[in-house]
Amino acid sequence: MASFWRFDMLPDPRWPPDVEIMKNANVPRLCWHSRLADVGDECGFKQRVVDYVKTMHLTVEKGRGLLLYGESGTGKTTLACIILRQAMARGPNKAWFEMASDIDFHGLHREVSSPEGYPVWDMLTEALYVVIDDLGVQRQKVGERISFDAGWVERVIRGRYNNQLPTIITTNAPEDVFAIGTGLEAIIREKYDIVEVAGVHWRG
């Protein structure tokens, strides 16, 4: 695995992302060309994200994930997509982006828009890296009760944990993730770097 990784990608504009790869991974078009260089160095979280990216080749086989949390509008989704692009740029790695609110029985069985035609469930459970974006929003739709969707989200997180596959999660608060299922807090604290995204300043 390590032989496929390129240390010079962070991302570098000399290697622009392949559009078809972005489409096949369901990455939002808005995030196709975002760069860590656009984040001001004064942002404390930036170095932790850089460190995670630089050590992906070492932690991938251990299933080391990343949980990005913070207020809405701080760029968590963009950061997650930048990291996901690293997995795709550094080797022939299958990757996938999914909104947490779209993870339900019907959504999981739709065909993805890739030549292979993998069902979403296969992508979520088998891709080397997966982003689950805005985790916790499905709880807000039904007040304090956990919705049916959350059960599927929990299955994805636990399944990837058991198979030691890295997952990148964005949320407004870690507590929203912990509340989805019994024991998830222990999983997150064991296998994820937890990074608060705040005070972001996107240049350019």
Q: What positions do the PLM features span?
A:
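P-loop NTPase Walker A phosphate-binding motif
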Residues: 78-91
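A short, basic N-terminal segment
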Residues: 1-52, 194-204
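Phosphate-binding P-loop
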Residues: 55-63
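Walker A/P-loop nucleotide-binding motif
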Residues: 62-80
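Residue-level preference for the first positions of well-ordered beta-strands
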Residues: 63-67, 94, 129, 166-168
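Short glycine-rich substrate-engagement loop in P-loop NTPases that contacts/grips substrate
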Residues: 46, 50, 88-127
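Walker B catalytic acidic pair
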Residues: 133-135
